[in-house]
Structure formats: C-alpha cells, structure tokens
Regions:
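Ankyrin-repeat intra-repeat helix-capping/turn positions
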Residues: 3, 38, 77-78, 109
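Compact disulfide-stabilized, cysteine-rich extracellular microdomains and processed peptide cores
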Residues: 125, 130-151
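Ankyrin-repeat boundary/"N-cap" motif
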Residues: 1, 20-32, 56-72, 95-104, ...
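Ankyrin repeat domain, specifically the short helix-to-loop turn at the C-terminus of the second helix
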Residues: 9-18, 44-53, 84-92, 115-121
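Short intrinsically disordered, low-complexity coil segments enriched in acidic
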Residues: 1-13, 134-135
C-alpha cells in the first residue's frame, strides 16, 4: 500500500465520499482528478466505499454539460485501466451531455472498452431515443431539463 491509498482507506472508513466539488473554475471532485491522472487504485477505494461512480462535474448546476468520471477517464488514451474500472463498477457508458463518452474517447483501448460495454455515440443515442437538445430551454425550465436534457 502506498501512503495515499492508506489515507484514502482511512477516510473511506470514516464515511468520506470524495464528492465535494472544486469551487474554482473546474467544478471537479478529487475523483475527477484521479480519473484523469489514471489513479485507478484511489478511485476504486472511493467508489467501493460508497462514492458515486457517475459523479458529475459541477460547472453550473443547471448545465447539461456536466461530465461524469468516465468522461474524464476516456479523454486520455493512457487511462484505459480507469475506464475499465469505472465500467466494471457500473458507470453509465451512455451518459450524454450532449456528447457521449464514446464521442470523447481517445485511444483504441478506451474505445473498445466502451463499445464492448454497449456505449454509443451521441448521434446513435439521438437516433435511438429521439433526443432533442435545446440548451437554452434546459437552462430556463427545470422540468424540461429533467425530461429532455439527461438520458
């Protein structure tokens, strides 16, 4: 065990969820940074300890552009182990922002992992579910947002 994982285990055992968003520009949680930096060991500890596998960034609470941990993981080809872990732990591979994780995936391993898990592009999701994006309406009307802005 490295010192960081020991600290995370300690915090998880005391109820930490690592779901506090950075109040600055990024709106990310520690888990988003771990996903982007290929730190699958800390992510696994946090998620198995009860953290949300589909935790979103929080740039704007009414924005449909909030991304999950999987979006962070697939942005780098080297993070395929994090991508695999998140899929194994139940991440939604078809979360749409209006782009999907598959649209954003870098590297053949990430793309293969997503496709094998049933991921679709945003165009495929739009066609299958007849999704209509009106971001202006999503920002104004919360009931519209709940019905049409999230899959």
């Amino acid at each position: 065990d490295n010192p960081n994982s020991q600290i995370i285990k300690y915090l998880v055992n005391r109820g930490a969820k690592f779901e506090v968003h950075d109040e600055g520009y990024s709106g990310r949680t520690p888990m988003h940074f771990w996903a982007r930096r290929n730190n699958y060991e800390l992510l696994e500890l946090a998620i198995k300890g009860g953290a949300n596998v589909d935790m979103q960034t929080l740039l704007d609470p009414k924005s449909e552009y909030n991304e999950t941990l999987l979006f962070e993981a697939v942005k780098e080809a080297e993070t395929y182990r994090v991508t695999q872990l998140l899929i194994e732990l139940g991440a939604n591979v078809n979360f749409i922002t209006p782009t999907s994780p598959l649209d954003n995936a870098k590297g053949s391993r990430n793309k293969k992992l997503l496709k094998d898990a049933g991921a679709m592009t945003s165009a495929q999701l739009d066609k299958k579910y007849n999704i209509y994006w009106d971001s202006e309406e999503c920002e104004k009307d919360e009931s519209y947002m709940e019905k049409y802005c999230k899959l």
